Structures are given as structure tokens and as C-alpha cells.
Regions:
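Basic- and aromatic-enriched surface patches that contact anionic nucleotides/nucleic acids
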Residues: 1-103
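C-terminal subdomains that position terminal phosphate/3'-OH groups for nucleotidyl transfer/ligation
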Residues: 82-171
């Protein structure tokens, strides 16, 4: 049979393997079937607490109202948008109007997942609670426009991130 005639190669990534190497290996091996998108790869290396944080952020009522339910999360698109907000908000220095230790979006998002993996449950809950407040404020301000360019219904990730970071820093 086809299965029995197939040769398998197995690589074990042990605990001593650097985390950024794990991201790189996933990206290189990720070629068969339906390829994983970057957020799905990050999800494999996130702790259950971080996965729950992103899932809760992307499914909370405040986020749904602020985005008018316009972000599809079938392949973790909404979770990636929430992580993008955490990254930009963490790396952006509001006083200097500049980024601290920013490595480009993809690498910064990878690094943020690894950093969030080290957070205590109370720190992750704080991120979720702050996010809920920001999304409530965004909904009150933007109402039916929900992070969209005029005349469009699709959520603009840059507008979402910008508004969310500005609202966070206004508090």
C-alpha cells in the first residue's frame, strides 16, 4: 500500500533547541497539504494560557462589536490581529514616537508569543481586560465605521492597530 511504501523522516526538536529555530523549522517543513499560516505556526509554540488569551481577545463581545464581527478567525486571522496589537503596543515608545527593539512584524510577533509564554496568568488577564476597555472605547468612537477605510467593509489591520494603540496610550 501507499502508506507502507512511504519513507518518513523524523526530526525531534528537544527542549534545548532555541525557540526561534523552531519557528524557522516549522516554516521550512510547512509545505505539504494546506500550509499553516504564520499565526497557526505561532499557535503551535504558544502555551495554552497564551492560546486562550488570544482566543478570548478575538471572541470577546467588545472586539466583536468594535469590528462589527468583520474579522474571520477560521484560520486565526482575528487572533493574529489581536497579537499584532500586543506587539505594536509593547514595542512602540509613546514618548519618543519610535519603536524599541522592533525586528519587523513577523519576527516581532514570533518573539512576542515566546515572551507571553513567560507571563503569569494575572499579567495575561490584565492584557485581556485592557483590550476589552480599548475595544469598548473604539466602538463608542467609531461606531459603524469599525477600522475600515471609507466606503469599504473590510477591517484594515493598520487602522485597527493604530487606533487600539492610540486609545491604550490615551488612558
Amino acid at each position: 500500500s501507499y502508506v507502507l511504501d512511504t519513507a518518513l523522516s523524523v526530526n525531534i526538536l528537544g527542549t534545548v533547541c532555541p525557540d526561534m529555530v523552531k519557528f524557522d523549522v516549522f516554516r521550512r517543513v510547512n509545505t505539504g497539504g494546506l500550509p499553516l499560516n504564520p499565526q497557526e505556526i505561532r499557535n503551535t509554540l504558544a502555551t495554552s494560557e497564551v492560546r486562550n488569551l488570544l482566543k478570548n481577545m478575538s471572541s470577546c463581545d467588545e472586539f466583536m462589536k468594535a469590528t462589527l464581527g468583520g474579522v474571520n478567525d477560521v484560520r486565526m486571522g482575528a487572533q493574529e490581529l489581536c497579537l499584532r496589537y500586543i506587539v505594536i503596543n509593547s514595542y512602540y515608545n509613546w514618548e519618543k514616537h519610535d519603536f524599541n527593539q522592533y525586528y519587523g512584524l513577523t519576527k516581532s510577533m514570533d518573539k512576542m508569543v515566546l515572551l507571553l509564554n513567560t507571563y503569569k496568568k494575572s499579567e495575561l488577564e490584565s492584557i485581556l481586560n485592557e483590550f476589552r476597555v480599548i475595544m469598548l472605547q473604539a466602538h463608542m468612537i467609531l461606531q459603524g465605521y469599525s477600522f475600515c477605510k471609507i466606503g469599504q467593509k473590510r477591517i484594515n489591520t493598520a487602522l485597527f492597530t493604530s487606533w487600539a494603540v492610540v486609545l491604550y496610550n490615551m488612558n
